[in-house]
Amino acid sequence: MKRRISIAIDGPAAAGKSTVAKRIAERLSYVYIDTGAMYRALTYRALACGVDIHDEQALLSLLRDTSIELKPSPHGQIVLVNGDDVTDIIRGEAVTNAVSLVAKHPLVREEMVARQRALAEGGGVVMDGRDIGTHVLPNAEVKIFLKASVEERARRRHEENLARGFPSDLEKLKEEIARRDRLDSERETAPLRKAPDAVEIDTTSLSVEEVVERIMEIVNERIG
């Protein structure tokens, strides 16, 4: 029986992390943990409750009072906040524009990381985010860092928005993604960084399946 390992997939906004991580988890029958969705869920609740997203203590109190569940379904992972399905609404523009501001707070990240590590206990997980290989799961057996050009990432997010029925402006998305890159890379707590032992893959000109195959080769080497 092959051992069940932890796989960390990091990278900037819209680099293809979630799409690839889901496929890898399906191929291996592993649990997929979308850490970005957890921060989006908190951001959604903060906006819905009128909590100041710049107030770290208020956000921490809200998080401690918030149940965030990631559950598999025939149509993909669903996100529940206090039992309510928020899968689609957390991908909207309001949450997207605010999530990096929520995620930069050290106490919020500390609480989230504790939850994420608990979900990953025992292995058999694929977790994606900004700081999985460097901070959340530093001992993950496989670490991948995905990157792509701002233009390509904006194009992907634009197509994703249109497919979901959201209004979308390609030029505005380019500016927003570049802004999120700066926020994620410059924050003091667990900034976006490639782990020294991570394998970097530039997905700009690769299909999803090509990226998945490259990662599966690495995974199969590790699990024997």
Swiss-Prot record:
GO terms for molecular function: ATP binding; CMP kinase activity; dCMP kinase activity. Its main location: cytoplasm. ATP binds at residues 11-19. GO terms for biological process: nucleobase-containing small molecule interconversion; pyrimidine nucleotide metabolic process. Its EC number is 2.7.4.25. Keywords: ATP-binding, Cytoplasm, Kinase, Nucleotide-binding, Transferase. It catalyses: CMP + ATP = CDP + ADP; dCMP + ATP = dCDP + ADP. One of its GO terms (cellular component) is cytosol. It is found in: Cytoplasm. HAMAP family: Cytidyl_kinase_type1 (MF_00238). NCBIfam families: cmk. This is Cytidylate kinase. It comes from Geobacillus kaustophilus (strain HTA426).
